[in-house]
Amino acid sequence: DISYDNCNADANVMEQIISDFQADGVDLMVGVATPVAMRMQASTEGTDTPVVFSAVSDPVGAGLVESLEAPGANLTGTSDYLDTASIMKLIEAVNPDTKKIGLLYDIGQDSSTAAIEAAKAYMDENGIEYVERTGTTTDEVQLAADALVADGVDAVFTPTDNTIMT
């Protein structure tokens, strides 16, 4: 039997789903996105229940695994890590006159950290100005995006964080 559910980014629902899975004695848990994977990891610590994660941008930085080569514990999965330098090069290839790039992300999302830092490093090394705007809700993200347009950015870079993706 396969049991599945979707918390729709609601932390309370996520907790209930994980508790239900544990009460049902599932043989394996699969978590999609960093917050779910982290909570599943914590809830299965000290048990034999393995956790497989996906759509986690920085599993090492999030503390899910010790390394990508040897994850450790009873946990493994896949990463959707962004090759930020390639994305920046693509932006420049599409618009060689790019002078200013907007960074749009949720500052509270662990999945944003590595990609945003890599983007800043690339732009610093290549003399590209950047403007950061953040939002923690859909409404704030819309306002931040509008602000980037008003700031006159030539392009916008968004990492794979859950708030921006919704």
Question: What name fits each language-model region?
Answer:
Residues 2-23, 134-149:
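Structural motif
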Residues 50-52, 76, 131:
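Structural detector of well-ordered beta-strand residues that form the stable sheet scaffold
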Residues 76-126:
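An alpha-beta-alpha
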Residues 104, 110-166:
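Pocket-lining segment of extracytoplasmic ligand-binding domains
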